[in-house]
């Protein structure tokens, strides 16, 4: 059986078979583990043939039914820093049969890759796609690619982040603003360009204090943008600060909230993994939204890992 494969010692082909559920009986959590192992090869191997093979195998999962898995696949491809992934991401963005959350993640990943050849496509979908989540994601990706290739980027004084992720926007320069209160105002000012609000968000993340976390939590309250709120929940999963747990639980429990926000809140609770997170996550295993149910499964696997002897 495929599930008996040791994912940490598996070949690329074995990882592909686990990821794509070739046997038909692989647990979702194990498919995610296979994905992250393939990502390590795609992002870190010096053998370009291996890198391209890992990326090709990862992209096979775009044929899957799982919205959660495909969205994570798109995210991972954006983190490989390899433009070989761009062809797959463009195809997903253009495919209206893919779920909005998957297409959004593909657009964001093109921004993470800094793919200048995708600018025209991103601009087209920014102007013409009916989904606000796709429009806003393309707006951010366009701004990120332009920023990355600008003189401004070379001149900015950015602190080295504790986090290795390639984010939808760079943090605000450390010499531009360092007061939490002012960053919070930029974060929550809906008249500011979304890119600047994201820059404030990632500056607050990198500050990482309880005060900064609570400032970020204020962005979950009344903002109309599901995209914006889902990014805050994602950032909380990186920070793993228990002070954010009440805001995440409130978000997860709010059935009026978009599934893309609630699912990210669930995964963040799995990463934080305090005792109060466990019963909350268990209570969402039968949620009305499939992506929230799947996220609860993955989050509980993360919770078990964080509280085990594996780390």
Curated annotation (Swiss-Prot):
Cofactor: Fe(2+)
Similarity field: Belongs to the deoxyhypusine hydroxylase family.
Function of the molecule: Catalyzes the hydroxylation of the N(6)-(4-aminobutyl)-L-lysine intermediate to form hypusine, an essential post-translational modification only found in mature eIF-5A factor.
Tagged with keyword Iron: yes
Entry note: cofactor: Binds 2 Fe(2+) ions per subunit.
Entry's localization field: Cytoplasm; Nucleus
EC number: 1.14.99.29
Extent of the HEAT-like PBS-type repeats: 69-95, 102-128, 196-222, 228-254, 261-287
Gene3D superfamilies the UniProt entry points to: Leucine-rich Repeat Variant
Enzyme class label: oxidoreductase
Domain of life: Eukaryota
Pathway: Protein modification; eIF5A hypusination
GO biological process: microtubule cytoskeleton organization
Protein residues bound to Fe cation 1: 71-72, 104-105
Keyword vocabulary terms for this entry: Cytoplasm, Hypusine biosynthesis, Iron, Metal-binding, Monooxygenase, Nucleus, Oxidoreductase, Repeat
Annotated SUPFAM superfamilies: ARM repeat
Coiled coil: none
Reaction(s) the record says it catalyses: [eIF5A protein]-deoxyhypusine + AH2 + O2 = [eIF5A protein]-hypusine + A + H2O
Organism, as annotated: Debaryomyces hansenii (strain ATCC 36239 / CBS 767 / BCRC 21394 / JCM 1990 / NBRC 0083 / IGC 2968) (Yeast)
GO cellular component, one term: nucleus
Protein known as: Deoxyhypusine hydroxylase
GO MF terms, alphabetically ordered: deoxyhypusine monooxygenase activity; metal ion binding
């Amino acid at each position: 059986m495929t599930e008996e494969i040791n994912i940490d010692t598996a070949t690329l082909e074995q990882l592909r078979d686990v990821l794509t559920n070739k046997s038909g009986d692989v647990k979702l959590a194990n498919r995610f583990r296979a994905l992250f192992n393939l990502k390590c090869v795609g992002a870190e191997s010096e053998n370009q043939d291996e890198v391209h093979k890992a990326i090709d195998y990862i992209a096979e999962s775009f044929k899957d039914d799982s919205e959660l898995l495909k969205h994570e696949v798109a995210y991972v491809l954006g983190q490989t820093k390899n433009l070989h992934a761009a062809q797959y991401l463009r195809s997903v963005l253009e495919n209206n049969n893919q779920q909005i959350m998957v297409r959004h993640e593909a657009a964001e990943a093109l921004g993470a890759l800094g793919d200048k050849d995708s600018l025209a496509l991103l601009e087209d979908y920014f102007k013409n796609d009916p989904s606000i989540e796709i429009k806003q994601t393309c707006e951010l990706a366009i701004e990120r690619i332009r920023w990355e290739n600008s003189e401004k980027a070379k001149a900015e004084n950015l602190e080295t982040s504790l986090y290795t992720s390639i984010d939808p926007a760079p943090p605000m320069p450390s010499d531009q603003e360092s007061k939490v209160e002012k960053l919070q105002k930029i974060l929550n000012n809906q008249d500011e360009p979304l890119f600047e609000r994201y820059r404030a968000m990632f500056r607050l993340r990198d500050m990482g204090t309880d005060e900064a976390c609570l400032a970020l939590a204020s962005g979950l309250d009344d903002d109309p943008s599901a995209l914006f709120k889902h990014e805050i929940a994602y950032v909380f999963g990186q920070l793993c600060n228990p002070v954010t747990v009440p805001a995440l639980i409130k978000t997860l429990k709010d059935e009026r909230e978009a599934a893309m926000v609630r699912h990210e809140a669930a995964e963040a609770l799995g990463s934080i993994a305090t005792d109060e997170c466990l019963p909350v996550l268990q209570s969402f295993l039968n949620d009305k939204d499939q992506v929230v149910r799947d996220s609860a499964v993955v989050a509980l696997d993360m919770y078990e890992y964080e509280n085990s002897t594996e780390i």
